Amino acid sequence: SEININDIEENPDNALYRELDTEEDIALLADDIRRAGLLHNLVVFPKTGFGGKYVLLSGERRLRALRLLVEQDKREQEEKQLPNRMSEWQKVQCKVVRNLTENEKVVYIDSANLQVRGGISNERVMRQAAARFVENLQKAPYNLSAAEAKKALKEVSPLNSRTIDKALSIQNDLNPDLRRLLDEEFLNRAECETYLRLTLKEQARAAAVFLKIAALDPRSHERRAIKDALTTAMLDVAVERRSMQERESVFAAALQNAQDAIGQAKTQENKAAAVDKDHNF
């Protein structure tokens, strides 16, 4: 079907991948399309309750590039005072799919992105996409077991099996606060893989202290030093074999040392803030 791109909406379920594409990426794709044409049709489904309107299922990068081409053509007409004509990119051939469940639509989006984008460079996006894909394959109409869903993920993704297993473990088994600090890039993936070796209670206790460190002034040397010291201590707790009593003793001491250092850093921050305030009067 030939559809006007103004009648096609972006899919909110694709928001996870949207940040991976820069304006420069879209501009390069637009140049390719202008030169070689649209090699792959957009895939859309009818928008319920809105006759003639569609929602995108596959091809968001292409849709954004087409919009850019239309904009460029319009600008050229205005600058050169040419007759106002519809851009050749305003209407494009689309594949229209019908009768998919909401879950099937999301699985379609994730499957396409996990295949086409290869090894997604953004750790958070890759991890969240992999987890969503596996979770949705366990729902109707697929109803796969967790093991079957994970196998299906490994078949569509070019990432190696260990990377996928670790990503799913971080998304499903890591303390939510630690995972949020990873998403915010305060912690890194290797560190969080280590924290999976801690018990859930230990993870929660460590997370509470890491949150306090993250709240310190990002520009301060102390923030980085305290974080590095606690990271090293947590690695030691996670990896070294000790009796339960000795492990708890080492773990508690590491948290206390970090708490003390945080207190000192806050005192320094407050003093610096007071000096700045005095200078401003």
Place the predicted regions along the sequence by residue:
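Glutamine-centric residue-chemistry signal
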Residues: 38-40, 115, 203-204
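Structural motif corresponding to the C-terminal cap of alpha-helices
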Residues: 37, 42, 138-141, 175
